[in-house]
Regions:
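Short, small-residue-biased leader/transition segments that mark boundaries at the very start
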Residues: 2-7
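Short, compositionally biased
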Residues: 28-30, 86-91, 151-164
Length: 189
């Protein structure tokens, strides 16, 4: 069970990370460099996977660690809060970025990973409980205050085998609804 990656209730998309990979989070297109604002970290995850977990109002807004290991301090990237309402975005075309926090992790089963929380309007508050130190699978890492938000996991090359159907559905621009405890992928040992 420890070698299976299980996250939380959400709508999931999984992208192979290549040089030009980009994806949309909260109506903003990001490359790995623009998402993390750290080219060295972005390069470290080349060839791996970006797992995007979109939470909606019907999802539980607390999130847990997906494996045991050691974590860094939380790194905050300030953004400008804007609504994710498509009607508002159609009338006011402006550059926007959401506030993000990420944690670097050395996991027991999945190698190096990065977990990022992304907040939006009315969900601007990301609350992470702990600083650097140990982490345990299934223990709450933090929560979003009010409404829907997004969690992004970056995983190293050759460390995890993602369920093929998730990759296929993402390729066809479809999210997959998953539940807490449902397997996303397995560690490659």
């Amino acid at each position: 069970v420890g070698s299976e990656m299980c996250i939380r209730d959400s709508k999931v998309s999984v992208y192979p990370i290549e040089e030009k990979t980009s994806f949309v989070v909260k109506d903003t297109r990001y490359t790995l460099d623009s998402l993390i604002r750290n080219r060295k970290i972005a390069r470290h995850f080349q060839g791996g996977y970006a797992v995007i977990l979109r939470l909606t109002v019907d999802d539980y807004h607390r999130y847990c660690y997906f494996d045991d290991g050691i974590k860094s301090e939380n790194h905050r990237i300030n953004g400008v809060y804007h609504t994710v309402n498509p009607i508002a975005n159609d009338h006011v075309k402006i550059y926007k970025e959401n506030t993000r926090e990420y944690t670097l992790m050395k996991t027991k089963h999945f190698g190096d990973a990065l977990q990022m929380e992304v907040g939006a309007l009315m969900v601007g508050k990301i609350v992470n409980h702990d600083g650097a130190g140990s982490m345990r699978r299934g223990i709450e890492k933090g929560y979003f205050q009010f409404g829907g938000s997004t969690i992004i996991l970056l995983l190293e090359k050759d460390k995890v085998e993602i369920r093929e159907e998730l990759l296929e559905r993402t390729k066809n621009q479809c999210e997959t609804k998953i539940r807490q405890g449902e397997m996303i992928g397995k560690a490659l040992v």
